Regions:
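Cellulosome-associated attachment modules in secreted, modular CAZymes
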Residues: 1-134
């Protein structure tokens, strides 16, 4: 199941390559969920979940997949490159503070995007070390 943070309005605790959030979250009786993917075929960072009561939107959440900093629902070399560029100062536009992408890049959740986050993603890509999504 996914974790819903009502303070930050983030949903996290999902895995890569999900076409839907079925089995991760469910709407309470009388409500429906509308999932809007940010890009591609998978639910990833920056995707949205609207909680609807009929035609009325009653809540709005943003999905965070730690390590997925481009929002395609896959943690791969593209994400690794974005963090690398951020750390060497050549591209800071996508990872501005407070954005869901910056949150996803801070995989160790210490409040900053650092070499430690870079190393965790590298370990995931090269050794299959899991990234904590909880």
């Amino acid at each position: 199941t996914a974790l819903i943070d009502s303070r930050s309005m983030f949903i996290h605790g999902i895995t890569e390559r999900l076409a839907s959030l079925d089995g991760y979250i469910a709407a309470a009786s009388g409500y429906t969920l509308n999932v809007i993917r940010r890009s591609g075929s998978y639910v990833g960072t920056g995707s949205y979940v609207k909680v609807m009561n009929g035609d009325e939107q009653v809540a709005f959440y943003t999905v965070i997949l730690y390590g997925d900093v481009n929002g395609d629902g896959i943690i791969d070399d593209d994400d690794f490159g974005i963090i690398s560029n951020y750390l060497n100062g050549t591209d800071t536009e996508q990872l501005f503070e407070g954005s869901p992408f910056a949150t996803a890049a801070d995989v160790d959740r210490d409040g900053a995007i650092t070499q430690a986050d870079y190393a965790i993603i590298n370990d995931y890509l090269t050794n299959g070390e899991p990234i904590n999504q909880a």
